[in-house]
Structures are given as structure tokens and as C-alpha cells.
């Protein structure tokens, strides 16, 4: 019986069932992608970046189609070639009774076209899907330009390595895949149709027909030719070789003098091998390509592996410093350029580490001390929550932020936070879908607290009578209530927050808002009022098509049937500020710490964006991200880069979600390429509002990376670099229970030239595997000097204590140790940010706030940290000893270290959010045992006059600080001292 007789046609009903099943499977696979694609299209339209979505989609589709067609066409050609050149006996079906593949041959022969196309598509589709993810590489190749800098080995512009070479490697990889699959499929097809047979004779184990030999030789020769091209491109990849890591990245002596020549030799051998395969077509002798292949493999082992290893072992290692010095010099220059830590951005200044003058005599030091930050944003989240939460469904992030504001002409740094909606804190009936997504939709207000003072000093911190209303932030609240009352310190026109970090922690994070006029508001605003969203943000869900799409996206039928959704309703989603920026600018890497700011009366999130590249020749490899440990305890791999620029500052409006990208680096070639890919998406620097620019901070992730690199790359001499003797280390965090590196700190310090307050990101550095202080880094955030990094270098034989030594000295002090013993009985102690402050014309002042929190066994108790003490450490000039100050206030601690008078320039506790109190505004400290009796109090008129003169003297001193005139400043300081003496003589309270 013929095969066609054995095969019966399927009934029509069965065919329909098969088609329906296939359609349902396709719908299940493709349907969710279509839903997400459609809702994303709506979202990109809402934020005004639909062109980005379209460009990415079109690029992906073109890549998918091109690679699928390329791989599929080559495979198709291989199958057709093998099928059409099959032996006649296979075509006629003769003498196949004992052929083991006869059954399969018959099946394929019935529908050769279907099988050919099917196999080609089946194998090509996965590679097409994989290729579409490389859209960034293709777009950078099409739009990339020159860096204006050439590499030290080949003399090519850096743009070749960043923009062009990755694309060439991508093309080569696709060709490799296509040819290799074609070779395998051609081999299989020839075997199926008899072009290749297991021979029964003793002379030949395998019989290969001439057409099969020709086809296999062509594809094998092509594959080897591609390998030759790969060897050629591998020469350029040596410029980021990891052979010498961790010493340095890039081609070393062995790479340049052994591996590079070996690559050229391998190119020549591979070309000869490819020619040998092509020659086998005419010569009809497979021994030639076989010997060529053996030569290629043997050469790869000897020339590519053993020879470089011998050079490394017997020539380089015995003379490593001499051999590697020229290449280390290349690495130093390239790394500095790639990470923006070269002499064009970094200023070095030798610094003795020992003070030579009194801080009171230096205007910049007076500014630094007056603005010494006592509030720690990593400690105060629960304090903010307990004192400013208002409702259980509001919340603050675990780590607050630091920014600065000019209030009444005075620049002050503030601990800032947005009072966001916390959906995960909803409880009971609040978690019902209708409440969670249509009633509790937004946060309320911007909270700020001056970072250099608290409301009052805590005196008897260890006693049971410790004040419950002391040691807490002084809040400046800009919310709905303060807006109505008209008493906002930082004016906010729209205090409602629909987009934020805490809001986005919910999954899903969407809210359905808005409604037609005349319909009663539904959203919770205050206890006495509801609200209807009127912003431009959100995707309309009034139509049934959109409601169905979002119901499918979130798997929520209530979106379809809820009566709370009307014709004017909108759905707000993608509410995380950093995620919104990453969506509209997928080519950016965002900083891990967005922060809120009030700009133009609106609350906006400021997000730092980085452009990166992975293959900058000779540049050291680094990572912007902190190490991440998963649930199993394994450290996850981090994205490695070798070029970084903080070229974009983005803002996200907290009310309507508007995303705006601003260019802040006009010399970044990577950003220039992306601006060509997505024209009009990034605003020029001239479009940045002055008020917004005043809130730009030097980004923390970039500073951490640069700090790690500067620990090594401050060294100029390659031989000294090789020995590592002059390296620095990032100090361990002495205040953290789990160890780790000390984080950088934002501080407001006095500018050495003008004495005006300057907002900077700072970090101490210690010697390599030592604990003594070696350097002090500070990055400017002020608009006029933004991005410059100052480095104070201490002598290599310095005995100035580093952060951990200082911490140990302070907590070992007898006063501290004795009180700590009492405190730990009923309190938890938090040692907050240990600030390193250069003062006294060469000295280092350490300031560390100490917070306490009452221990309690009561469930859900409302205890939270309060500032209890201030620790101060300073190296004494001359003797080199360390002076420790420990007191309820910074002023008292400074007076213990520097003597009476220095504390007068510190900011006292109390006052309101805009105005600190006069220097005498602190409660009196209890007299020490055995002290002489206090003098009789002065008259009220004398004390009033003394306070008035003291305030006038302080005002005069602040004015003198801003003039930069040292003579005027000295006179103002003398007047202040006289006023202090008069005030004390009149019975005023000392610090």
C-alpha cells in the first residue's frame, strides 16, 4: 500500500478544532504582549514621549525581521541546495528498502517546501527575538560620532570602540549563527537524502557525494573566514583585556607583544584554512582542509595560548614594574578621562592635617561650624513618620534626603521628604479595591527640617524624666492645611503627591482618578474634604476599549464594572519617578536616590541620569550600583561600565507626572548620539530654570564610583601605581552595625575664598590598609562650580585619625563611656553620620550626633530617635593629642575642645524653621559638683540690653561673612566676643 493510501484526511470538525486550539494558544502567548503594548502606547502618549516608544518598537521590529530573514534565508538556501543536489537513487526511491531514514525521507518528500520553510523559520525565529534586544547597539552605530580622543595603541577615535565595534561584532555573531546552522542543517539534509551515507565497504566508512562535499566545503570555508574576521576584531578587544586585573584594565605587555601578534598570525592561518576548504571543491581531496583545520587548532593552542603564557611567566613577571609601566600609564590617562576625574575636573591641594589657627578667626570655618549638620537622614525616617505622618496611610521613605533652600536670604541645608501615600499601610476596609484605588490616591505635602539644629537640647537623657519634646527636628510643613493657613516657609502651590517612591512600592500601584464636573469628589484629601484630580497626568479610561485593556493588564474585573469609573476618569500608573524616567529614556541609567524639591511652587522629583559605555579602551571597569545580595545570600552580578557621565538631570512632577529631561553636559558624545536617535526629548541647558539648577546635587552613585577610582587613580607615576603604596581606601563605616564602606555625606561648608556657604558631597579617605586619614574629597553642587572635585591630600606620614579611629576614641572617652552605660539600660543608641570637616587652616574636625530611642516592651509603641548628644573630635596642634567634646549641644562640645568662645558661632537649638535663636537661647546646664555659687542675677534692663547687643553682633557677623573682607570679619568677631562677655556678665546663660 502506498503511503498516500495509508494517510486518511482529517475530518472537517477535527481540522476546525485544531485551528481553534492553535488560535487560542497563540492568543494566550501573544495576547498579554498586545495588551501591554497597547496600554504602554497610551501611557507614552500621555507623557508626551510616544516618539520614543515608536522609535524603539520600529527598531526592534526591523532587527527581528532582518535577523530572522538572514538566518532563515541562509538555512533555507542550505536545505534547498542539499535537496536539489540529492542523489538520483534518493530522488527515485530505489534501493532504499534497508535505508534506516527511508521513512523520514518519504515524509519530507511529500511536502518539501513546507518542511524547508518550516525548518528555516523554526530555527531563525529565536535568534530574531534575541536580536531585537540589541536595538541600542544598532542605533548608536547609526548615530554615534567622534569623541575627539584616540586610543594609545591603534590610534582610532574612541567613538570607533564605543559606537562601531559593538555593531561589527553583532553582525559577525549573526553571520556565525546563520552559517553554523546552515552547515549543520545541510549536513543533516544530505544524510537524509543520501548525499552522505554510512558506507558498507571496508575502504570507506562514510561516502560523501560530490554535491555534498561542495556544499559542506563552502559553508565550512565561510565559517572559517568569519573566524578570521573575528580574530581581526579581537585585536581591538585587547584594549579592555582583563589579564592584568585587579592591577589595571587594558592591554599589558603580554597582550601587546604576544597576544596581538598571535591574533595577526591566527588571521593569516584562518584565511589559509578557509582557502583550503574552498580549494577542496576543485581538488576533490578532503585531506587539504583537514590538515588546514588541524593547523588552525594547533596554532590556536601554541600561538594563541602557550606562547603568551611563556612571555608572561618568563619575561613579564620577573620585570613586571618595568614591563607594565607604559601600559599602566595608558590606563591612568584613560580612566581619568572616562570617569571625569582628570585634572580638568579635579583639583589637588596639600593639607597638613593639623590646625594652625583658631576656627573663630577664619570666616569660612565660622560658616562651616554654623551649618554643621546634626540631623541624619538615615536615622530620622521614623521620627518624621511619628511626628508628621498625620494618617496611617501616609508614609516616608526609609532614607530621607538632604537639600538646601535660601530662606530670608540665608542658605540652609534641610532634611527633606515628601509625605506620600503608602498603599501598603492601608488596613481593614481601606484595602477594599474601591478605597485602595479610587479613594486613597495621593499624598499630602512637603516636609523639611533645618539640618543644623533641633527644637531644644536634651539635658537629662539618661534619666526617666528625660524631656519628651526635646531633640527633635523643627519642621517646615508645606501641605494642604498650611496652604490654607498661608503660613508655608517653603511655598507650595500644589501639595498633593500622586507620584513618588513610597507610592510605587505597592503592586500594582495604579489609581483611578478624575471625573466630570458636578459629580461629588471621591478622593480623600482631608478629614473634612474630598478631591477630584484635575492634572494632565493619567490615561483616559472612559472608553470600554481602554477599560478592557487595563482590566486585562492588571487582571482586575472591577475596572470593567465599577461605577466609580466614568467618562472623564483616568488611570495613573508607573508612579515611581526613576521608573518613569527610565521608560521615556531607556538609554539612561538612573541614580538610586531621587529626591524631592520645591521648584516654582511645585513639588518635583529630581532624578540623575547617566550615560554609560562598556568598552572604553584602557579604562578601568567599574559599577554604578551597590552590590546586591539576593535571598540566598549570593551577590548578584552588577552591570559593569568603563565610561560614565552624569549628562542628564530629569524632573518628574509629583502631581501630574510630567517628565522633563535636561542636558547638563554638552561635551558627552554618548548623549549626543542619543539626542540624534530621539530628537527633541532632551531639553538644552538654557532651558533649565535657575530655581531648579539651584537644587541640583552632585549624584551619590557617581561620587561613590569616582571615590573608589580616585583611591588608586590619584597616583601619577606608573611605578608607584604598580606598588600600590600610595593608594587610599574608603574607610569602613564606624556607625553601622553591619560594617561596609562609610557613605559620602552632603554638607554645607564655608567656601575658602568667599566664606559663603557651599553645598558639597564629601568623603574621607584613609591609607591603603591603614586607618589614618589620607585625603578628603568634596564635590561641588553649587551652580557656579558644579561638578568640580577638590581633594585635600594629607602627608603620607600623617597621624591624623581616620573615621574609625576617631569613633573608637570618642566612645572610649570616660564621659561618653559612663553615660553610655546608663543610656543602654533604657535606650537604644544611634551613632549618626560622622562628618569630617576641614577647619582651622589645616585641621580636621569630626562631628557626630548621637541619637537615642527609649526602649519599651509595649507593642506598637511610638518611640522614635531624638538627638541627645553631640560628639566632637579634633587633633590638638603641637602635641598631636586628640581632644574630645561631648555635650548636649554642638556649641558646648566645641567649647570643650577649643575653649570658650568658639561655640558662639555654632547654631543653637530652638527657633523656628527659618530663624535660629540667639546664641544664648539654650537652657542652662546644671553646675558641676563643687562649683562656686552663681553670681546674683542682673537687672532685667541690663540683660535685655545685652541680648539686644548680642543679636546685633550676630547679625553684623553674618553680614561680614558674606563680604569676604577679613578685616571687616575680624572686627565683627571682636564685637561678638565683647557682646558675649557683656551678656554673660549680665547673667545670661552660657552654652
From Swiss-Prot:
Residues 902-940 are annotated as: Disordered. Pfam families: UPF0182 (PF03699). The chain crosses the membrane at residues 16-36, 61-81, 115-135, 170-190, 214-234, 263-283, 291-311. Residues 903-914 have a biased composition (Low complexity). Residues 915-938 have a biased composition (Pro residues). It is a multi-pass membrane protein. The keyword Cell membrane applies. It is found in: Cell membrane. Keywords: Cell membrane, Membrane, Plasmid, Transmembrane, Transmembrane helix. GO terms for cellular component: extracellular region; plasma membrane. Belongs to the UPF0182 family. HAMAP family: UPF0182. This is UPF0182 protein RHA1_ro08670.
Amino acid at each position: 500500500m502506498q503511503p498516500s493510501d495509508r494517510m486518511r484526511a482529517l475530518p472537517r470538525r477535527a481540522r476546525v478544532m485544531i485551528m481553534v486550539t492553535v488560535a487560542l494558544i497563540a492568543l494566550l502567548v501573544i495576547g498579554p504582549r498586545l495588551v501591554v503594548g497597547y496600554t504602554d502606547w497610551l501611557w507614552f502618549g500621555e507623557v508626551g514621549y510616544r516618539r520614543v516608544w515608536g522609535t524603539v518598537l520600529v527598531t526592534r521590529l526591523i532587527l527581528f525581521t532582518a535577523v530572522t530573514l538572514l538566518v532563515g534565508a541562509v538555512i533555507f538556501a542550505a536545505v534547498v541546495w542539499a535537496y536539489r543536489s540529492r542523489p538520483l537513487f534518493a530522488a527515485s526511491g530505489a534501493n532504499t528498502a534497508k535505508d534506516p531514514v527511508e521513512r523520514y525521507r518519504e515524509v519530507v518528500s511529500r511536502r518539501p517546501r513546507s518542511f524547508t520553510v518550516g525548518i528555516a523559520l523554526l530555527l531563525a525565529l529565536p535568534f530574531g527575538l534575541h536580536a531585537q534586544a540589541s536595538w541600542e547597539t544598532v542605533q548608536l552605530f547609526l548615530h554615534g560620532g567622534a569623541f575627539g580622543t584616540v586610543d594609545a595603541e591603534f590610534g582610532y577615535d574612541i567613538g570607533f570602540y564605543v559606537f562601531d565595534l559593538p555593531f561589527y561584532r553583532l553582525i559577525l555573531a549573526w553571520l556565525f549563527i546563520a552559517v553554523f546552522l546552515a552547515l549543520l542543517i545541510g549536513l543533516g539534509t544530505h544524510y537524509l537524502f543520501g548525499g552522505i551515507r554510512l558506507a558498507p565497504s571496508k575502504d570507506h566508512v562514510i561516502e560523501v557525494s560530490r554535491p555534498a562535499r561542495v556544499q559542506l566545503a563552502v559553508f565550512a570555508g565561510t565559517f572559517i573566514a568569519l573566524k578570521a574576521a573575528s580574530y581581526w576584531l579581537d585585536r581591538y578587544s585587547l584594549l579592555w583585556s582583563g589579564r592584568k586585573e585587579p592591577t589595571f584594565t587594558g592591554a599589558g605587555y603580554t597582550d601587546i607583544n604576544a597576544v596581538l601578534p598571535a591574533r595577526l598570525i591566527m588571521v593569516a592561518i584562518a584565511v589559509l584554512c578557509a582557502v583550503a576548504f574552498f580549494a577542496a571543491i576543485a581538488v576533490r581531496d578532503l585531506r587539504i582542509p583537514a590538515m588546514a583545520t588541524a593547523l588552525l587548532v594547533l596554532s590556536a593552542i601554541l600561538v594563541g595560548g602557550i606562547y603568551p603564557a611563556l612571555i608572561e611567566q618568563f619575561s613579564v613577571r620577573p620585570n613586571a614594574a618595568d614591563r607594565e609601566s607604559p601600559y599602566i600609564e595608558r590606563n591612568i590617562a584613560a580612566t581619568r578621562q572616562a570617569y571625569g576625574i582628570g585634572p580638568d575636573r579635579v583639583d589637588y591641594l596639600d593639607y597638613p592635617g593639623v590646625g594652625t589657627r583658631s576656627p573663630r578667626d577664619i570666616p569660612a570655618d565660622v560658616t562651616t561650624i554654623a551649618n554643621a549638620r546634626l540631623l541624619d537622614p538615615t536615622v530620622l525616617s521614623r521620627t518624621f513618620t511619628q511626628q508628621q505622618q498625620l494618617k496611617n496611610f501616609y508614609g516616608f521613605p526609609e532614607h530621607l534626603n538632604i537639600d538646601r533652600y535660601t530662606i530670608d536670604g540665608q542658605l540652609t541645608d534641610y532634611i527633606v521628604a515628601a509625605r506620600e501615600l503608602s498603599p501598603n499601610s492601608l488596613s481593614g476596609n481601606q484595602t477594599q479595591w474601591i478605597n485602595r484605588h479610587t479613594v486613597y490616591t495621593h499624598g499630602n505635602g512637603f516636609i523639611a527640617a533645618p539640618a543644623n539644629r533641633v527644637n531644644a537640647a536634651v539635658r537629662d537623657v539618661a534619666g526617666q524624666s528625660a524631656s519628651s519634646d526635646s531633640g527633635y527636628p523643627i519642621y517646615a510643613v508645606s501641605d494642604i492645611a498650611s496652604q490654607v493657613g498661608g503660613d508655608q516657609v517653603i511655598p507650595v502651590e500644589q501639595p498633593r503627591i500622586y507620584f513618588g517612591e513610597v507610592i510605587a512600592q505597592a503592586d500594582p500601584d495604579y489609581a483611578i482618578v478624575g471625573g466630570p464636573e458636578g459629580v461629588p469628589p471621591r478622593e480623600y484629601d482631608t478629614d473634612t474634604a474630598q478631591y477630584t484630580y484635575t492634572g494632565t497626568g493619567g490615561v483616559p479610561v472612559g472608553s470600554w476599549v481602554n477599560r478592557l485593556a487595563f482590566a486585562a493588564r492588571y487582571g482586575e474585573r472591577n475596572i470593567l464594572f465599577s461605577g466609580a469609573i466614568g467618562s472623564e476618569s483616568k488611570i495613573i500608573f508607573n508612579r515611581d519617578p526613576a521608573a518613569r524616567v527610565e521608560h521615556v529614556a531607556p538609554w539612561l541609567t538612573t541614580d538610586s536616590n531621587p529626591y524631592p524639591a520645591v521648584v516654582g511652587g511645585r513639588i518635583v522629583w529630581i532624578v540623575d541620569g547617566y550615560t554609560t559605555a562598556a568598552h572604553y579602551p584602557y579604562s578601568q571597569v567599574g559599577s554604578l550600583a551597590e552590590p546586591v545580595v539576593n535571598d540566598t545570600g549570593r551577590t548578584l552580578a552588577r552591570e559593569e561600565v568603563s565610561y560614565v557621565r552624569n549628562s542628564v538631570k530629569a524632573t518628574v512632577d509629583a502631581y501630574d507626572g510630567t517628565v522633563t529631561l535636561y542636558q547638563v553636559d554638552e561635551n558627552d558624545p554618548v548623549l549626543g548620539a542619543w539626542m540624534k536617535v530621539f530628537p527633541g526629548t532632551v531639553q538644552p541647558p538654557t532651558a533649565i530654570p535657575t530655581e531648579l539648577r539651584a537644587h541640583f546635587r552632585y549624584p551619590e552613585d557617581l561620587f561613590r564610583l569616582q571615590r573608589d577610582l580616585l583611591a588608586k587613580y590619584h597616583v601619577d607615576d606608573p611605578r608607584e601605581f604598580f606598588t600600590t603604596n600610595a593608594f587610599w581606601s574608603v574607610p569602613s563605616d564606624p556607625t553601622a552595625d553591619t560594617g561596609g564602606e562609610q557613605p559620602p555625606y552632603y554638607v554645607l561648608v564655608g567656601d575658602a575664598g568667599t566664606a559663603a556657604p557651599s553645598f558639597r558631597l564629601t568623603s574621607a579617605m584613609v591609607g591603603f590598609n591603614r586607618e589614618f586619614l589620607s585625603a578628603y574629597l568634596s564635590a561641588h553642587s553649587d551652580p557656579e562650580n558644579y561638578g568640580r572635585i577638590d581633594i585635600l591630600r594629607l602627608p603620607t606620614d600623617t597621624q591624623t585619625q581616620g573615621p574609625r579611629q576617631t569613633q573608637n576614641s570618642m566612645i572610649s572617652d570616660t564621659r561618653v563611656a559612663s553615660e553610655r552605660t546608663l543610656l543602654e539600660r533604657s535606650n537604644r543608641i544611634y551613632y549618626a553620620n560622622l562628618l569630617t570637616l576641614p577647619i582651622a587652616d589645616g585641621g580636621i574636625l569630626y562631628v557626630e550626633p548621637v541619637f537615642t530611642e527609649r526602649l519599651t516592651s509595649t507593642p506598637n509603641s511610638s518611640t522614635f530617635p531624638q538627638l541627645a548628644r553631640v560628639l566632637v573630635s579634633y587633633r590638638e596642634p603641637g602635641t598631636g593629642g586628640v581632644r574630645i567634646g561631648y555635650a548636649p549641644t554642638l556649641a558646648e562640645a566645641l567649647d570643650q575642645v577649643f575653649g570658650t568662645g568658639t561655640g558662639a558661632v555654632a547654631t543653637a537649638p530652638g527657633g523656628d524653621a527659618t530663624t535660629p535663636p540667639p546664641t544664648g537661647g539654650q537652657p542652662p546646664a546644671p553646675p558641676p559638683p563643687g562649683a562656686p555659687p552663681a553670681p546674683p542675677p542682673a537687672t532685667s534692663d541690663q540683660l535685655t540690653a545685652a541680648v539686644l547687643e548680642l543679636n546685633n553682633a550676630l547679625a553684623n557677623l553674618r553680614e561680614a561673612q558674606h563680604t569676604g573682607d577679613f578685616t571687616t570679619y575680624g572686627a565683627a568677631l571682636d564685637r561678638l566676643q565683647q557682646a558675649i562677655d557683656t551678656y554673660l556678665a549680665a547673667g545670661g546663660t552660657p552654652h
